[in-house]
């Protein structure tokens, strides 16, 4: 069931990223003057992120989140497969299902009856994020790794990258805290589900509403 769910979720990512929902997000997503972080959609599936003097492009494909540093012209990726995320940055793989199987959603089927929105919370340790993002990552790479981990956990979150960036940029010293790599502390992410029409099927998707440290 888990393998079926993961395959279904990954196969929908491109479809979801090229529907009017994301097209409507074209333009500035947020501009946080306090943290000097801003981002905007430059194509249906590509996001431009400015973090201080760093400029990055995040691209979401069917089962991959790619981060390109436009200053150094280096490209890295997070590959999602069967509840796992592999990082080209570190060469490491994080198994989301190893301890978080209770967080797997049931998004492997369309919604056939009256729908009631749900709220879920999931925890991600700093150790997992650092294992994927590396020891000197900026907010763009950290956000991309979080989005990949949520996808591997079964949360279908179209357009989640700006939400994640906005929330983590508001946490003082977040990147430095992540780089410490604690396995006992991390982030608690709250997601709220909603229904969405995808080519005639009503699907359950998720919006990231809150990220706090624990």
For the regions a language model picked out, list residue spans one by one:
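Sec-dependent N-terminal signal peptides of Gram-positive bacterial secreted proteins and lipoproteins
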Residues: 2-25
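Alpha-helical hydrophobic membrane-insertion segments
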Residues: 5, 22, 133-136, 168-171, ...
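N-terminal propeptides/leader regions of secreted preproproteins
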Residues: 21-128
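Active-site-proximal helix/loop microenvironment
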Residues: 159, 175-178
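Residues within alpha-helical transmembrane segments of multi-pass membrane proteins, especially transporters
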Residues: 13, 153-156
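Hydrophobic alpha-helical transmembrane segments
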Residues: 158-168
């Amino acid at each position: 069931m888990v393998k079926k769910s993961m395959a279904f979720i990954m196969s929908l990512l491109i479809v979801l990223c090229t529907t009017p929902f994301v097209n409507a997000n074209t333009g500035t997503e947020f501009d946080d003057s306090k943290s000097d972080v801003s981002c905007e959609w430059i194509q249906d599936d590509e996001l431009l992120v400015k973090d201080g003097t760093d400029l990055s492009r995040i691209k979401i494909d069917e089962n991959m989140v790619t981060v390109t540093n436009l200053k150094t012209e280096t490209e890295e990726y997070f590959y999602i497969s069967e509840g796992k995320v592999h990082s080209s940055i570190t060469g490491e793989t994080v198994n989301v299902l190893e301890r978080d199987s209770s967080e797997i959603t049931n998004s492997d089927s369309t919604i056939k009856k009256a729908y009631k929105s749900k709220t879920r919370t999931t925890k991600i340790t700093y150790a997992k994020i650092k294992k994927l993002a590396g020891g000197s990552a900026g907010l763009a790479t950290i956000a991309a790794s979080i989005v990949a981990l949520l996808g591997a956990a079964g949360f279908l979150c179209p357009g989640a990258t700006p939400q994640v960036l906005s929330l983590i940029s508001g946490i003082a010293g977040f990147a430095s805290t992540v780089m410490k790599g604690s396995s006992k502390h991390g982030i608690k992410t709250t997601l709220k589900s909603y229904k969405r029409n995808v080519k005639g099927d009503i699907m359950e998707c998720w919006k990231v509403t809150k990220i706090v440290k624990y």
